[in-house]
Amino acid sequence: MKIHKCSFCGAEIPPGYGIMYVRNDGTIQRYCSRKCFVSATKYGRNPRKLAWVRKRQK
């Protein structure tokens, strides 16, 4: 089993968890939670500007 990384926050996603989102161009994006999924797709937020994201620049 492969452990994937969240496309938004960079957290590790264990097998059987998370959301796999396939865009129209065929790219696969994986999200650890609905919070990450909605922030990326619906609101178009930049993960580097959010305090709760692990990928954030310090």
Curated annotation (Swiss-Prot):
GO cellular component terms given for this protein: ribonucleoprotein complex; ribosome
Start-end of C4-type zinc fingers: 6-36
Entry keyword Zinc: yes
Obligatory cofactor(s): Zn(2+)
Pfam families for the chain: Ribosomal_L24e
Cofactor annotation remark: Binds 1 zinc ion per subunit.
Keywords: Metal-binding, Ribonucleoprotein, Ribosomal protein, RNA-binding, rRNA-binding, Zinc, Zinc-finger
GO biological process, any: translation
Listed GO MF terms: rRNA binding; structural constituent of ribosome; zinc ion binding
Keyword rRNA-binding included in the entry's annotation: yes
Binding site for Zn(2+): C6, C9, C32, C36
Functional note: Binds to the 23S rRNA.
Subunit structure: Part of the 50S ribosomal subunit. Forms a cluster with proteins L3 and L14.
Annotated family: Belongs to the eukaryotic ribosomal protein eL24 family.
Protein name, entry field: Large ribosomal subunit protein eL24
Originating organism: Pyrobaculum neutrophilum (strain DSM 2338 / JCM 9278 / NBRC 100436 / V24Sta)
Origin organism lineage: Archaea, Thermoproteota, Thermoprotei, Thermoproteales, Thermoproteaceae
Gene: rpl24e
